[in-house]
């Protein structure tokens, strides 16, 4: 099972600056048509960026880091940043969604 966590101060700042609530952004991380890419490594932590739908209408890009939960079964996604997708990111997402899904070999 996938669980989510975030810094509440960062979430409040993100909502103010980008108009995207981290709670709503969770939907992008479980969107079956999401595009997930490696973003960067910070202090040994692999960070990903995912473009997907949130609340059925807004395509968002979410920066996050995933880790295994203490029980060794579940996964925790720590949301770091969320924003509306750029026109190019939105176009790529819509193209992939129309084709039935993302294949990493397409990159």
Where are these regions (language model features)?
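Ribonuclease/tRNase effector modules and their secretory precursors
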Residues: 1-107
